[in-house]
Design a protein with these regions (language model features):
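Sec-exported extracytoplasmic/periplasmic mature domains
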Residues: 1-4, 27-34, 73, 85-89, ...
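Short acidic catalytic loops
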Residues: 1-14
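Gly/Ser/Thr-rich loop/hinge elements
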Residues: 6, 16-75, 102-108, 122
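Terminal peptide-recognition signature
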Residues: 9, 29, 65, 84, ...
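Extracytoplasmic/secreted proteins, especially bacterial periplasmic and envelope-associated proteins
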Residues: 20-24, 35, 75, 79, ...
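Short, well-structured beta-strand/strand-turn elements
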Residues: 72, 87-100
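Short acidic, Pro/Gly- and aromatic-enriched capping/linker segments at domain boundaries
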Residues: 110-120
Length: 185
């Protein structure tokens, strides 16, 4: 944190994870006991009161934050982005996310299992990313070539020297726009 001027949180390609983990991550950026998500189900037992960020000592993080999303950012990553957007803590940059705002329960059935959607989750403002996704504040079109370079970048250690050289000259358009966005905050 010392000397940090801004943070880019890259959630591109992140398929999600546990709701509780997303709430814990949000606790790194928001004050304790901030309401960040609630669930709404057809059955009242699947509707929850708002989940809050953890009660823990939080370092003062006043630097600007940009969250990077793409069409493959889903579920818990959408919750993190949506809550930070709703609470004006981050600028969302990139593409509209996947649109998976569902809460699912796995029901074991012998040698198989059934995954049943029991609710949708909602950001602090009450919106759900289900089907519509999280719409970025700064939209950036990502070309197929940029998408391929991003995949290469993530496995850079396994690339040949020639492949690394191509990446050395590549400028990630989403990161570039995110840096512009945080420099204006």
């Amino acid at each position: 944190d010392r000397g940090m001027e801004a943070l880019l949180l890259d959630l591109r390609g992140n398929p999600g994870g546990l709701l509780t983990a997303a709430v814990s991550i949000l606790g790194e950026f928001l004050p304790p006991s901030t309401e960040v998500v609630f669930t709404r189900g057809r059955n009242p037992e699947h509707t929850s009161p708002a989940m809050k960020t953890p009660e823990r000592k939080r370092r003062n993080r006043s630097y600007p934050v940009a969250v990077l999303l793409d069409r493959d950012s889903a579920s818990a990553s959408e919750l993190v982005a949506g809550a930070l957007q709703d609470l004006a803590r981050a600028t969302i940059v990139g593409e509209t996310s996947y649109g998976k705002g569902s809460v699912q329960r796995v029901m074991p059935m012998g040698n198989a299992a059934l995954k049943l959607t029991i609710a949708t989750y909602h950001t602090p403002s009450g919106r759900t990313p289900q089907e519509s996704g999280i719409i970025p504040d700064v939209e950036v079109s990502i070309s197929d070539e940029d998408r391929a370079n991003l995949r290469r970048q993530r496995r850079r250690d396994s690339l040949t020297p020639d492949q690394r050289q191509i990446l050395d000259s590549w400028v990630d358009p989403v990161v570039s726009r995110a840096l512009q966005a945080v420099s204006k905050q």
